[in-house]
Regions:
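Short coil/turn segments at secondary-structure boundaries
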Residues: 176-180
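Short arginine-rich
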Residues: 156, 173-175
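Beta/alpha (TIM)-barrel catalytic core signal, keyed to glycine-rich beta->alpha loops juxtaposed to Asp/Glu
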Residues: 1-167
């Protein structure tokens, strides 16, 4: 199987088209890997529509918003977390702002209402998105892996999916940035 990672929509289309140009000679693209979560929905702009059109599956990386969607950062940065690491803190920090906290609160509320965990709600949401084949989880121990795998039994009600869609709706500017600030 062949796949690509972090390609924008036009790059994905170009690679997939090139692969298809010689049937039987080149391997068809099976997947693309991009960051995708309730905190990062940018792939919905171009990458996901291209992947769906091309029959290429999406492997979302950081489906838990770099760990933030688990709720562990709601009251501070745990000492044993990636956010406390000097090396990884810059990776986590962009998702510790006010808009992200509103999304994390919505995930926690949904989890409480479903008697499950925020991790499971966030992972189920991304798992059920169109074009997603399998979220990539970064479990650091057996307990985290077990919890992530148990999401297979969770089905989110439509009302919760819609509420999470609404609170995390991306702002798409023409075409990809706010030109009024230039």
């Amino acid at each position: 199987y062949a796949g690509v990672s972090n390609f924008c929509g036009w790059q994905l289309a170009k690679a997939a088209t090139w692969q298809l140009a010689s049937p039987g000679v080149r391997t068809r693209l099976a997947s693309t890997q991009m960051e995708y979560s309730l905190l990062q929905r940018g792939v919905e702009r171009e990458v996901l529509p291209a992947a769906l059109d091309l029959g290429v599956g999406l492997l979302p990386s950081s489906p838990l918003g770099r760990g933030v969607l688990t709720g562990k950062y709601r009251t501070g940065t745990p000492a044993d977390s990636r956010g406390a690491s000097e090396l990884l803190a810059p990776f986590v920090e962009p998702y510790l702002d006010d808009p992200a906290s509103r999304i994390v609160d919505a995930v926690a509320t949904a989890a409480d209402g479903l008697a499950t965990t925020a991790l499971q709600v966030a992972l189920a949401w991304v798992r059920d998105r169109p074009g997603v084949v399998a979220p990539i989880v970064g479990a650091r121990n057996a307990q985290q892996l077990t919890e992530a795998l148990s999401v297979e039994a969770l089905s989110l009600p439509d009302e919760i999916c819609q509420a999470l869609d609404d609170v995390s709706a991306p702002v798409h500017r023409y075409p990809d940035q706010d030109w009024s600030t230039l």
